Amino acid sequence: GGGGLAAGLALACPDTAIHVVEPEGWDMVGRALANGEIVHVGDDPPSTICDALQPDATKPINLAVLSGRAEPGVTVTDEEVRAAQRFAFARLNLVAEPGGAAALAAALAGKAPVDEDTVILLTGGNTDPASFAATLVDT
């Protein structure tokens, strides 16, 4: 969390539209981009299954790289993330941790544009086996 992956993509792929996807209530990068300044998490942030996407704030270097380069931020719900995890497992034979499935969740929920040139990063298999099993059976 904090925009490091998005900033790295922006540097590596300068002619590419970058869509930052974060869990609801933890959209510090998206809000920082919208406000033009660092935004910190509130005193009582909501819970989320996306534990890898829970920064206190974005880093100044990430905001500097992404400013003027990234599209408006997108947020996803835990249920949208679970649906993406199920999709990745059933259709792609991949195990994705919740935070790693956030971009796929945004695409599947219609919150981020998808066309023939879209690349969705599906990262991380570091997920609790019991939680992942519960996600798979919860349809």
Explain the meaning of each model-derived region:
Residues G1-T139:
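PLP-dependent amino-acid enzyme catalytic core
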